[in-house]
């Protein structure tokens, strides 16, 4: 499954979280959602008891989010998400959707704000990790990516005489 393309932009990530959350009906998710949306929703439902257990260790997360103290959430949840493999990425997205559902159910804040906040926190983390790794977290390092190799071959074909011209010294 090539899912990294769905995480490339803020709008597509926001739509993905919205469609995988509980606020979207299963009919709407089936018709307008992607395979990744359904996989994330299924993972969220299957592991909801484990996610609830993880959140029970830090009961102040929702209170701090409601008060606008987002650094606690960043330190406890966001920094511990792992996007090193496709499975871990799906489980991280499912956990964020679970938190979004729980937070939306018990907050006075609008659903748009909660969705935007979760999307922005996740988006910033993905951008930061992409910048640090030099590649997308779910993609192999440089030299192992077949798409990049094809692009490099096309560039070489366009510039066939690059190595044949004699060097000129100035």
Curated annotation (Swiss-Prot):
Region described as Disordered: spans on this chain: 137-170
Domain of life where this protein originates: Viruses
Main location: host cell
GO biological process: symbiont-mediated suppression of host apoptosis
Gene Ontology cellular component annotations, sorted alphabetically: host cell nuclear lamina; host cell plasma membrane; membrane
Protein keywords: Apoptosis, Early protein, Host cell membrane, Host membrane, Host nucleus, Host-virus interaction, Inhibition of host apoptosis by viral BCL2-like protein, Membrane, Modulation of host cell apoptosis by virus
Stored PROSITE patterns: BCL2_FAMILY (PS50062)
Compositional bias segments (type: Acidic residues): 148-158
Annotated compartments: Host cell membrane; Host nucleus envelope; Host nucleus lamina
Coiled-coil intervals: none
Family as reported in the entry's similarity comment: Belongs to the adenoviridae E1B 19 kDa protein family.
Role summary: Putative adenovirus Bcl-2 homolog that inhibits apoptosis induced by TNF or FAS pathways, as well as p53-mediated apoptosis. Without E1B 19K function, virus production is compromised because of premature death of host cell. Interacts with Bax protein in cell lysates.
Name this protein carries in UniProt: E1B protein, small T-antigen
Species the sequence originates in: Human adenovirus F serotype 41
UniProt lineage: Viruses, Varidnaviria, Bamfordvirae, Preplasmiviricota, Tectiliviricetes
């Amino acid at each position: 499954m090539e899912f990294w393309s769905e995480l490339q932009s803020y709008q597509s990530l926001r739509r993905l979280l919205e469609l995988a959350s509980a606020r979207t009906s299963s009919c709407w998710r089936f018709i307008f959602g992607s395979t990744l949306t359904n996989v994330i929703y299924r993972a969220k439902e299957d592991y909801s008891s484990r996610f609830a257990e993880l959140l029970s260790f830090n009961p102040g997360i929702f209170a701090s989010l409601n008060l606008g103290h987002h650094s606690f959430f960043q330190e406890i949840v966001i920094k511990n998400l792992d996007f090193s493999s496709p499975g871990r990425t799906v489980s991280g997205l499912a956990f964020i959707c679970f938190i979004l559902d729980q937070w939306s159910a018990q907050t006075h804040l609008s659903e748009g704000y909660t969705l935007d906040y979760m999307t922005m926190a996740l988006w910033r983390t993905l951008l930061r990790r992409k910048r640090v790794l030099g590649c997308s977290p779910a993609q192999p390092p440089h030299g192992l990516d077949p798409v990049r190799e094809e692009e490099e071959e096309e560039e070489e074909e366009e510039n066939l005489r690059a190595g044949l011209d004699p060097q000129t010294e100035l």
